């Protein structure tokens, strides 16, 4: 048998695993449903109904019931980290770097031309980031049909949104830090 010392993130993952938890499932006893941003919860409800994930009846419940239905409240009645990331106004209060950073680089890795940061609840970060990337960072082929301007981007917005969501979730859950986008 060999003895091995583990520290840092590896130790945290091991301890959580022995408790049957994941990083995003850690309870936050000092956070309550009333601390969550109402606009973010409302945005979630609207998007869920519009995309057919939930019905109008599903979202006509109290915020506490919604969080419970989404499994964002643990067995002791505490909100978990995932709820805070998705709906809390300032998730950086709880998790350092819980924001998206976007950079436009010139000819080299050290040639940062300009950058932006997107803060707030994760549910809002995604839409704000997609809008920012499509208006400021991504180039489109432009065509005209009569007087109407038609922009054709390299990625369909829904596909880019999915890529962005995967990058954010993967980064936040494994590293617990900021997600970054790089455009060269």
List each model region and its residues.
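Conserved N-terminal catalytic/coupling substructures associated with nucleotide/phosphate chemistry
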Residues: 1-184
């Amino acid at each position: 048998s060999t003895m091995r010392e583990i520290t840092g993130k590896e130790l945290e993952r091991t301890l959580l695993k022995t408790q049957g938890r994941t990083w995003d499932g850690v309870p936050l006893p000092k956070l309550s449903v009333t601390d969550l941003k109402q606009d973010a919860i409302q945005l979630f409800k609207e998007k869920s109904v519009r995309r057919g994930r939930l019905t109008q009846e599903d979202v006509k419940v109290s915020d506490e019931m919604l969080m419970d239905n989404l499994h964002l409240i643990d067995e002791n009645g505490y909100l978990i980290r995932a709820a805070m990331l998705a709906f809390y106004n300032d998730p950086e209060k709880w998790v350092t770097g819980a924001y998206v950073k976007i950079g436009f680089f010139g000819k080299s890795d050290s040639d940062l031309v300009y950058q932006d940061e997107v803060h707030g609840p994760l549910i809002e970060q995604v839409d704000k980031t997609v809008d920012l990337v499509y208006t400021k960072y991504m180039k489109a082929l432009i065509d005209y049909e009569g007087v109407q301007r038609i922009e054709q981007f390299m990625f369909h917005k829904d596909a880019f949104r999915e890529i962005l969501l995967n990058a954010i979730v993967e980064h936040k859950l494994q590293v617990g830090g900021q997600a970054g986008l790089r455009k060269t």
